[in-house]
Design a protein with these regions (language model features):
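Domain-level signal for soluble alpha/beta catalytic cores
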Residues: 1-149
């Protein structure tokens, strides 16, 4: 109905995280011919707890994490990048991240879509990581330690 009423873009913004928003984006893409938007919150919502307001923390019974204690539910930059690629593959073209997103989330989303944002220069060079890197200049005892992690 939104498209018939003149909407240029139909989609979802906020409330749901990537995992619980993606199936709905697929349904929207099937239902409309216009552009589709997908802007999840960067939190690990589930089928049992589909919105970031409904998340519960097993480490703090009786305490609701929303709105100020959502830290343990934060998506990684890789999860946001995977969401962006999957949403793009579904045909969503208006993509972003809503409440709680950090610069690293936005940068990861842009990079996953083949963009080259100015912030790309801040992507960590993991080849130089003291324990996990592959650079020949790294100390062997550090790399040996990594195999014991």
């Amino acid at each position: 109905r939104l498209e018939q009423a003149g909407a240029d873009v139909v989609g979802l913004n906020c409330i749901r995280g990537p995992e619980t928003m993606l199936p709905m984006i697929a349904e929207i893409r099937e239902a409309v011919d216009c552009h589709v938007a997908a802007l999840p919150v960067p939190y690990r919502t589930t089928d049992a707890e589909p919105s970031f307001q409904s998340l519960t923390d097993p480490h703090r019974p009786g305490h609701r994490p929303f709105p100020t204690s959502l830290d343990p539910f934060m998506c990684t930059r890789e999860e946001i990048a995977e969401f962006g690629a999957a949403a793009w593959d579904l045909g969503a073209r208006y993509l972003g991240v809503c409440c709680g997103a950090g610069a690293h989330h936005i940068r990861a989303l842009a990079l996953a879509l083949g963009r080259e944002p100015a912030g790309a220069r801040y992507v960590p060079d993991m080849s130089r990581h003291a324990f996990l890197g592959t650079d020949a200049q790294l100390k062997d005892h550090n790399r040996d330690y990594a195999s014991e992690l």
